[in-house]
Structure formats: structure tokens, C-alpha cells
Amino acid sequence: MGMEPHDEAGEPSVSREPDFADIARIGAELNRLGARYVVVGGFAIIRAGYPRMTTDIDLLIECTPENERLVLEALSILPDKASRLVEPGAVEKYQVVRIGDEVTVDLMKSGCGVDYATAMKDAQTHEVHGVPVPFASPLTLWRMKQTVREKDIPDRIFLKQKLSDDGTPVEDPVPDVSGILEKLRRWLIRLLGGK
């Protein structure tokens, strides 16, 4: 026990924290195979200018069977070959697949309604250790961070200010509670035995 790293669930982690050298290594292999992907999440936030920690690499991928196969093949460059344990079609089926290898890589079908095709419309390619890597734009990241997760709040604050400074002010979305209110109304009717 002691100071070993832990994942978000508090379980001991066997993966080390990734860095931009990992982004370059994985990106080079994804590019070599012609896989369609865009970096989202923590590394994209860091690339946008917000210095923060991240424990994984988040990739939004095009969810065709062929592209998913290419992405998994590219990730087999990691030493434990954990991507080989992922069944074909898993990302399409489960929306997010976590691959725990030397570093943790999350493969995503979409986030907050943003899929690969949408993210690529304004993605920005940056050289990372000489490798061209597509990153989600700050506006796309803003859209993808509209969650109830407490850990997304600092990212939203940063992105809102960055977008405003860049001339693209955004407003915090007003949550659509109509569905929740309707369910509550029906539940109260059943509870009280009325119409």
C-alpha cells in the first residue's frame, strides 16, 4: 500500500501517467495505419493552454468496423498488448472502452452528442514531437464538457474564458429539465392515486 497511483474508482492502477511523448508515439502509429481519430479530454485541454493533470489519453474515433480495427491495431504497440483483448465492435456497442496498458487509453464513440465527424469539422492539427496529431478545438471541447461531473467544472471555466478571449463567447447551457419534470409529475400522480 502507500503512494501507488489509483484510478478514478480508487483502485490501484498499473498504468503510468501518460505524457505528450505517448501522444506522439500512439499518434504516429494511428497515422501510419490511416486510422481516423481526434484527441479529446485532458490532453486536448492542456494543448489548448490549461496546465492540468490527466491520467489517460482520450481518443474520439470514427466507429466503423474497419476504423475500430485500425485503432486497436495501432494501440497494440503498447507493451502489454491490451488492445488485442477488445472485441470488435466494442466501442460502437459500449460508447467508451478503456484500455489499460502501459498508459490508459479511452476510446470514445461520442461525448455529449459530439462524434468523430462533428469534432473533425474544426479540429486543429498540432505537431507533437514531430508527429501531426488532430486535437479537438476549444469549442468542441466546451461542448463535450457539458456534463454533471465535478471534475469538468475547471475545464469549462477555462474553456469559457478562452473562447471569450478568442472572440467566441459561449453561454452555460440551460439544462432541459422538462423530461425530468414530466417524470416527476407522473410519479406524483401514481403516488397520490390521482389523474
Regions inferred by a protein language model and the residue ranges of each:
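Compositionally biased terminal segments of proteins
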Residues: 1-195
